[in-house]
Amino acid sequence: MPTPTPPIYFGGASPAAEAIAAEHVDVYLAWGEPPTMVAERIERMRELAAAKGRALTYGIRFHVITRSTSAEAWAIANDMLAHMTPEAIAEAQTDFSTTMSEGQRRMAELHAGDTAKLEVHPNVWAGIGLVRGGAGTALVGSYEEVAERISEYHELGFDEFILSGYPHLEEAYWFGEGVLPILRDQGLVEGATNQPANISTFR
């Protein structure tokens, strides 16, 4: 065994996955859902883990679209939506409707394929999930708004944030330049600098 032992990250929304996580993993992961939905999951996982004499750390997965203004960020999200044809959306949603994945079912239910109901919580956009399987929500907004949403999810109990974007490099730049300084000033990020690093840990 390596020393120190690397933490085990694991995600799954089914009862079977939750039982495995409660007994074996270090960090339980959830896809980005509205706060009320993920708060219920954290509470359930805390109870399951406590029954095993354990306590878990919690992480959440989002895409990010952030710019200096909210209007700029939403313009990018809307442009992405404009490139999703009705046929592509319908095909993807049909595929998702037959999945055995509980997490995928929950993602699809956020919008039910309706392009008019994609902001499922302030700054939480489910548009990516119209055509993409897996994590289908993005934090969309100004630097301040995205930082506020991260703070909100942190207060629910999430200490790990697994973030990505389209394109990855460019969105990492905007997040690093605009959002990280705010989170650092709020004391929510340890070890975050403007220099490349292997990991940044949220408190």
List each model region and its residues.
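Structural motif
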Residues: 23-24, 156-157
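Glycine-rich, proline-tolerant flexible connector loops at the mouths of alpha/beta enzymes
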Residues: 32-36, 160-176
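Hydrophobic faces of well-ordered beta-strands that scaffold small-molecule active sites
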Residues: 8-11, 26-30, 56-63, 161-164
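An alpha-helical appendage that flanks or caps ligand/catalytic pockets
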Residues: 33-155, 184-203
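Alpha-helical segments flanking ligand/cofactor-binding loops in enzyme cores
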Residues: 18-22, 151
